[in-house]
Each structure stands twice: as C-alpha cells, then as structure tokens.
Amino acid sequence: MVNLCNLLLKYDHFSKVEDDIFIYIDRVLENASEIYVRQQKAKRELECLEDQLAEKQKQSNRCVLPVPRSPVKRRKVQSLDSPLSAQKENVSILEDSTIFPNKSDSDVSAKLELNILDSEEPFFALTQSPPPAAAPQSPSPRAILSPRNVSKTSPLRPMQLLFPEENKSEKKPLLRESRFGKSVKLLESSSVVAEKSNTPTTPKTTPNGKWTGKNANATIETSNTDHTPPSGLKRFLSLADSNQRFRQVKLNFPRQTKQSPMNEPEHNSVNDTLFSDFVVPTPPSVANKSKFLKSLRMKKQSTLISRAQDDKPGTKGGSDETSSSTAASNERQPMFPNDNDDDDIDQTYCPGVESTSKLSKGLSFKIKQEPESQQKERIPLKVPSNKKLECLSDHILGVGEDSESNEIIVLPAPSQQSVISVAESQNATEIFISELNGENAKRMDAVTIETNPSNVPRVNRELGELSGSVKPYTRGYEQPSPQGLCIDCTMLYQYHTTRGVSNDTARSKLPRNCRNCRVAQLHSTPPGFWDPDFLPTPE
C-alpha cells in the first residue's frame, strides 16, 4: 500500500484516472507474492526428496552384487593352459573382430598372416588384450564375513613376444624387402660389390645406342608391327629382374618406303615474281650500327622526302609526276610557314628511302607521292582582327560559324586586355555559359560523336523548355575524355574544364607521373596505328 500511495502522490495530476486500475494493480501484486511463497515451499520439498534419493542410492550400492566377468573373457584367460582343441572351439564361437582386433591395420595383419606358429604356442590368447582391472568397491561387512563364491584364476605367465625375429638382427627378416625399394647407395656400400670390384674382370661391350637398356649379350630384336609386345605380369617381372629396368628403351619404328622423306619428290622452286611487287621495310634493328648512326639515318630519311626534290629540281630520271608534286608543294609552302615538320607525316611511306645512303649520289630516285585526292585539306589560319579582339564572345561565336576544325585563339598582350567582369544579371551568365559550351563542342572529335551515343546532348522534350530565368547549367556530356589518362585523372580533368578552365591549364593541374596514367598509355592503341597510309605499299 505504501507503493500505491507513492504512485498516487506521483501521478496526482491525472485526475481522470478511475479507481478500478488501482484495484487491478493490487490484485497483481498479491498474486505475485503468493507465487513467490509457493515457489519457496516447492524448493524445500525438492531438497528433501533429493536427500532421500541419495540415501536410497547408497543403500542399494551396498546390496548390489559385483557383476562377474563374461564367460568369454574367462575362457580367454584360461586358454593359456588349455590345449589346442579348446582354443579352436573358442575361436569358432567368437567373431573375427574380437579375435583379431588389429585386422583393419594392414601392417599388423600382414605380419600376423605371415607368422607361422607352432601348435603348442598359445596364439589365441596372445592376440587378445589383457582383461581390465576391476574397480575397487567400497568395503562392506558382508564382503569380510562371507567372500564371493568365484573361482580363482591361475596366475598369468609373462606374455611371449609375437615377433621374436625383430630383436635378432643376424637372422633374415620375415618379410623380404621389396624389389623396387633397393637404393643404389646400399648396393655400393655392400661388401659383395667391393669384392667384385677387386677381382680382375673382362670389360663388357656396351651397346652403341643412346637410350638402349638391353644387355650386351642379348640379341637385338627387330620390331614386328604384326605382333604386340607381351603385356601383364610376365613382362613386368622380366623388366623388374633386369639391372637397368628403369632406363628408357629406344623404340625402333619400321620406316615405310612410301612415307620416307628420302623418297619425296623435290618440289619446284617457288616463283617469287608475284612478291616482287610488294616491298616490306627492313626494321632498323637489322643493321648492326650504333644508336647514334641510326638516329642520324632516320633524320636523313625524314628530310629526304620533303626537301630533296626541291633542292634538285633537274634530276635525270625525274618524271612528270615528281615535277608536278614539287610544284604543288611549292605552292602550298607560303600558306603554311610552320608546317614543315608535319609534311613528311602525310606523305606515303617509301620503303626505298632507307637504303639511299648506301647508293651513289648520281642515281635518281622515284619517290611515290600521295595523290591529291588523299591529301589532307588544310584551311589557312584566320587571324582575328582588332575589332574581334575587343569582344571575345563575338569572336568565339564567329569562329564557330566559319570553321569546323580546331582553331588557335590569339589573345592580345595582357596590357591591352580588358578585364572581363561577370555581371550579376542572369542574362550575362547565360551568354558566358553558352560560349563555354560552344567552345567545348568545337574541341570534340567527329569520330567520338559518331561512335559514342552517350556524347549526344540529351534534350528532354516531354517536360518542355524551362523559362529563361531558371535555365540550369547542363553537365557537359559532349566533352570527350582526354586520351592517356586514368579514371581519377579524367574526373579531375573534367572538373577543371567544367569550371571554365582551358584544356592546357586543366592538364597542368593534373598530378605528374601518375602510375595509372602510364598503365593506361601502355595499353592504349595510338590513333594512327591502323592507318593504311603507314602500311607497306607496292612500288
């Protein structure tokens, strides 16, 4: 009730609680106390029962007779003095597992089977384990007054050894050593071999064959294809008995006259006239020269294609094709003053250029020029005017309309540049973002647009276009990932390019000597690897 009063004081502000709930709580507490009292009473009764049970068990242990040993065990012990006929009767009664406990053990069972015993030897008893010692029982007055009426067993004789041969090292062992277990060292160290080596012997003639394992006096048998060699135990024993049984024997296969290589007709020499049209370039590693001479020769080769024809316009064997090609190259030169290094890349590969240094200078060489239809079209560089330099955004839009190729934007000196300040109005940021997107689209390669469907800008037409004031900046799916970069460097590169940084600046911000980038460059194919212009061409 004290607890109930405390509860009432604690929850006094719950005025709407009815009195029935307190009556219910009181009944629950009374039931719990009654259960506790009954549990204590049951524990006391259980302890009394356990004490009575322990006393009864002690009394029963005093009265219980000791279990005598089984008659089979008794017969086993008495079989030491019994004759052989009694042993055989005992064996017939019992099972194999009780007689031979070690039957599953292969080593023990093999020795037991091979051991031939005398008829008087107690074989049956020797294979059995000794009887277990009886547990000491509590002394009782009855045991002292009247002893048990059990027949006394005769004292056991000491057990004889089952294998007495193991102790005597002079005698020959019961199990002979296997034929294949003999080691060469034992044979060499034996006294018989030493005696044989001392006696003078005539040298035996050894067979000439490299792999022959036959004896010298044995006749060489010719192989017969109609008769198969004997297989089975006979052949195995004959191989095992020989001294050189493990050496490989050379197989004599009869050579058939039809398939012999000596009788094959000589094929006519292959006609090489068809292959003379195609010249395969010799790799530079064939010539045994130093690396410095190789590099000099490669420099001569690169200059010879583009400039040698301009220096010698009047060569003896110069054809109309070479003169027209030199004229075409002279016309193109003023338009591209800085493209001299790029000229010999676009020329058709000439395999004869490598051997020009060995020939005399008086001879003229015919170098195949690339046809005009296959040459790359070059668009002259448009230098922006001063008006366009003033407004950078107009210049970027104008270049995007005029040309499709990648252009170089020439910026004025930093003193002439005007500081570009981005206004806070929404329209100025939209123009800046659109210019960035246009510049990134121009850098994109045409091949990546066709092959990669993910590069196509995605337009969601179902939702309709958003209003001009809420247009977000779309992520540049159209930006091509730079070649030779790993995944982490590519993500970092895209992060810098989306911020509006130029490609070169974004490249400079990437970590140097990245191991993953080097691995990616090793496993990537160069862009012009499968270009047919660089493959060997006919003369």
Curated annotation (Swiss-Prot):
Subcellular location(s) of the protein: Secreted
Q: Name one GO cellular component term.
A: extracellular region
Does this entry carry the keyword ATP-binding?
no
The disruption phenotype is: RNAi-mediated knockdown has no significant effects on mosquito feeding.
Q: Where is this region: Disordered?
A: 126-153, 192-231, 303-355
Q: Offer one example of a GO biological process linked to this entry.
A: immune system process
| Composition bias, Polar residues | 216-228, 320-332
Induction data: (Microbial infection) Induced in salivary gland by Plasmodium berghei infection.
**Keyword set, alphabetical order:** Glycoprotein, Immunity, Inflammatory response, Secreted
Where this protein primarily resides, as one coarse class? Answer: secreted
What is known about the tissue distribution of this protein? Saliva (at protein level). Female salivary gland. Female midgut.
Carbohydrate-modified residues: 31, 90, 102, 149, 167, 217, 271, 288, 427, 503
Q: Where is the composition biased (Low complexity)?
A: 192-215
Look up the further comments and give them.
Laboratory mice bitten by Anopheles gambiae mosquitoes develop IgG antibodies against AgSAP. Sera from individuals living in an area where malaria is endemic (Senegal) have higher IgG reactivity to AgSAP than sera from individuals living in an area where malaria is absent (Marseille, France). Mice immunized with AgSAP and exposed to infectious mosquito bites exhibit a significantly lower Plasmodium berghei burden in the liver.
Question: What is this protein's function?
Answer: Binds heparan sulfate proteoglycans present on the mammalian cell surface. Modulates host immune responses at the site of inoculation via decreasing the expression of TNF-alpha/TNF, IL-1beta/IL1B, IFN-gamma/IFNG, IL4, MMP9, TGF-beta and ICAM1.
**Protein's recorded name:** Sporozoite-associated protein
Q: What is the lineage of its organism?
A: Eukaryota, Metazoa, Ecdysozoa, Arthropoda, Hexapoda
